[in-house]
Amino acid sequence: MNRKTNLFAKKFKKLISLGVISVLAFSMVGCSSLDTADRREKSARTGENVTLYAACDSGADTVTAKFMRDFAKRVEEKSNGKIKVETYSDSQVGGDSEIFEACQGGNISFVFQATSPQVSFIPEAAVLDAPMAFDNIEIARKVLDGELFEKLKGYYSEKDLVLLGIADQGFRETTSNKKIDKLSDFKGLKIRTMENPYHIKFWKSLGANPTPMSYSEVYIGLQQGTIDAQENPLEAIIVPRFYEQQDYLVNTNHFIHPVTCIASSKVMNSLTYEERAIVYEAAEESKVWARNTTDKQLDDRINVIEESGTEIINLDKKTLEAMKKASESVWDDIENDIGSDLIDTLRDEIEKYN
C-alpha cells in the first residue's frame, strides 16, 4: 500500500471508528474475479442488503456531488432499498487522487470526478484535454456518449475500473481584468491554470502567461494582482466569487469540463447480474439528470455574475476559430503522448456531429 493510499486509509479508518462507515465486507476487496461457482452462489442470494460507498472531492453544492447523490438515490429506489449507496463529498475520505486509488482497490465503490486528476493514472484520458474541440455543448455530449466513450472504457478497465458515464459542468470559461475580444488580447495575460501540461500549453499557444496555482489561492491571487485572470467552469467561478475581483467574464468555451462516474471493477464483479444492471441503469439516468442540472444552473450563474457588475463578453466566431488554429499544436502534443487512435476518433466524432 503506497503513501497516498495510507493517507486515505487513515481518514477512512476515522470514519469507521465514528460509526459512519461499516466494514466493507460485501465489496470482497480481495477478489479480482469470480469463478462460475461464485456467480451461481451470488445469483442465489435473496433478501441480502448491500451497502456501497461513493465519494467525490467536490463540495456538496456542486453538480459533481449532486450527480453522485442522484445516482445513489436511484440505485436505492431501483433495488427497492436492497442496495444503499452512502455518499461522501467535500474530500471527506480523501482528495481526487486518494479516492481514485481507493476505488481501484475496491475500498470505495464509486467515484465522481473530472478527468484531469485521472490523467496521471490513465494517460489516455488526456484526449478530453484537447482544446477548442467543440462548437457547442450538444456536440460535446454526443461525442462523450459515442465511440470515443466506448474506447475510453477499455483503458479504464485496464486499471480495474468501470467507466459508467460522463456528465459535465459545461465549458471552462475565462474571467479577466483585461478586456478580451480578439486573439491578440491574450498576449501576456497572467492567467491561473490547473497544473495540467496540456492546459498550460494551450494558454501559451494563445500568447498568454499561464501560472499554475492551487484553486484555494486564486481569490487572493486576483485580489493582490499576482494574476490578471483565471479559467474554470462557471460553477467553480461562482462558489468562491472570483467574479468579485474581475471586470470581465469571457465565454471562451476552451475546454469541456467532464465529470466521470467510475466504479471499482472489484466491487462490480462482486454484485449479481441484476445488481450490476441496476447500477448501469442508474448511472445512465443520473448522467442525463446531471447534464440537465448543469444547463438549468448556467443562466442563473451568468445572471449572478452580470448583476455584480462584471461585463459578459461572447467571443465572435472569427476569434474562436483563431484560438482553435493557434492551439492545434496542443492536439499534436496529446497525440504524441497517447497515440493517434483516440485523437482520430475524437476528430471523426466531431466531424460526424458538426
Q: Each PLM stretch: what is its role?
A:
Residues 1-51, 354:
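Short, low-complexity disordered leader/linker segments with a strong preference
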Residues 32-138, 148, 157-354:
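N-terminal secretory/targeting leader peptides
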